[in-house]
Amino acid sequence: MQRINEILDAKIIEHHESQKKRDYLGVSSIGDDCLRKVQLQYEGKEAEFSASTLRTFDIGHCLEDLVAEWMRISGFNLKTKNENGEQFGFSTAEGRIKGHVDGKIVDVSEDLKQFFPRFPLLWECKTLHHKSWQETAKKGLMLTKPIYFAQVQLYMAYLSLEQCLFTALNKDTSELYFELIPFDSEAAQRYSDRAVQIIRASENNEQMPCISADPSFFKCKMCGFRNVCRIKGN
């Protein structure tokens, strides 16, 4: 029966590799602490993921849909698609920077209005394992998940929204964490400048710095781009 798993894994990877390649800089990656990694994504290089990791990604998307439904039945007027049935998003810099958001909260029931001074709100949802979830619930998004923090700040900037309700599902206990995050114009500008810097470097055939020149650095060893990063080992 192990052969079934092997066939399944191979087909999942094959399907992933057959999908249309991204030809823009995704906002979800701009906050990463390795500029070289972000640049490789922008340049269309493909990260290497195991079938198990790809399944985990898919499970996360399904769980986010479930969280959205829980929120709707609890009094949130949450929209995850626009009037054309497409995911909310934006495109800027002549299509070189794009973002797609989980949703917008346009209103809430009366018992929830005390928590939200204005609408609409950006809604962004993540699924986290227990330890990561606990850390975020204790210290907040900005300190524990800088990539996600950059993501929501840029979303708010480009969609002209003043607040984001960040929601995290604990995949081990089903607990939910909510954090109301205000728009920070300085942070958004800083991340936007970083995106422009990466695009310009690629246009000039310049390499952005890697987080480490040592391929044995723990983040490099876990990176899906470890086999295509030209800086490592130089």
What are these regions (language model features)?
Residues 79-80, 122-124, 163-168:
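A structural signal for short, well-ordered beta-strand segments and their strand-loop junctions
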Residues 1-122, 129-131, 142:
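Metal-dependent nuclease catalytic cores that hydrolyze phosphodiester bonds in DNA/RNA
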Residues 125-127, 225:
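Residues immediately flanking
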Residues 135-149, 154-234:
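Metal-dependent nuclease catalytic regions and adjoining charged, substrate-binding loops involved
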